[in-house]
Amino acid sequence: MECNDPFVVALKDKGYSLVAYPKTSIRPLHIYEHTIKNAFKRIWIQSEAQPTSGFIKSLFSDKIHGAIGLSDGQGIDIDLRKTNSLSSAVAAKILESYFQDSAPSFDLAFENSSSVIFHIEEIITTDADEISLRNWLNDNQNELREIYKEEIKKGNFFVATSLLRAKKMRMQFERKNKGELGVDVSKIKNLPVDAKLESKIEGSTYDRLVFETPDEGIVFGVKLVRLFFSDNGILTIDKKQDFNRVLGENMALNLFTEIQDAGFIEVT
């Protein structure tokens, strides 16, 4: 059964497999009406590709060019406090154009070791979200239901989010039946040496994976959760969607988070 979600199809056509953003549902191949100013104060986009002034001018009009700078020839520095004109469409164009040659595949990491760094300032949030994965699969109106059921049976069910440098964070994944819920730990890069990442058996029915950072470290993000599948595409869940409509039986994802001060999202 082929996944016909327009977002998944567009990503596959471009060679992408996963895109992660903080706090918003901006997608790099789609244009949204809202701006990204509520999520970002400043953006620094870094790549192995060498940006040029001509490239900058091709992306931005002169009226917002004053907000754009180069960082030692290695990236683009966008100070959103200097412009009111940077929309999600511009952000989409940055990502699609800037990395189309240097990174043909995007799966929480660029395969050619390029990196994208979104610097974020003044993030203060405390969040405790619970996503149980039950009712969604029982919705007969959802045409992707069987795809996800099959992926769960095959063990290709993963949960991933953005990466966030924060003062403190704890995430806990539980599953009743061993093998149902997987966390793709291999995609997490640059973990602090003293970060805790362990799997625990609680009694005879629960398998628990706990990820906890030290006082500061690169950890999972909290505002955007993406469920993705190795073969059949991507399902995106964010704050604008109904968290009570969920995937799977006897499965739950619990995020216990405490994020303070400024940080940055890093995909490496």
UniProtKB/Swiss-Prot annotation:
BP GO terms, sorted: defense response to virus
GO cellular component: cytoplasm; plasma membrane
PTMs per UniProt: Palmitoylation helps stabilize the inactive state; may self-palmitoylate. Palmitoylation is not required for permeabilization of liposomes by the ring-like pores in vitro. Palmitoylation plays a significant role in pore formation.
Keywords: Antiviral defense, Cell inner membrane, Cell membrane, Cytoplasm, Lipoprotein, Membrane, Palmitate, Transmembrane, Transmembrane beta strand
Top-level taxon of the source organism: Bacteria
Impact upon substituting residue 247 to A: No longer cleaved by protease, non-toxic, liposomes incubated with bGSDM do not leak
Variant or mutagenesis effect after changing residue 244 to A: Reduced cleavage, still toxic
Region (C-terminal region): 248-268
Lipidated positions per record (S-palmitoyl cysteine): 3
Listed transmembrane segments: 78-94, 103-121, 168-185, 195-211
Residues of the site described as Cleavage: 247-248
Family to which the UniProt record says this protein belongs: Belongs to the bacterial gasdermin family.
Comment text on domains: The N-terminus has marked structural similarity to the mammalian gasdermin N-terminal domain. The C-terminal region wraps around the twisted beta sheet core, probably stabilizing the inactive state. The C-terminal region can assume multiple conformations. The beta-stranded transmembrane 'fingers' of the active protein form by local refolding of several alpha helices found only in the inactive state. Reorientation of the N-terminus probably flips the palmitoyl moiety for insertion into the membrane.
Protein name in the entry: Gasdermin bGSDM
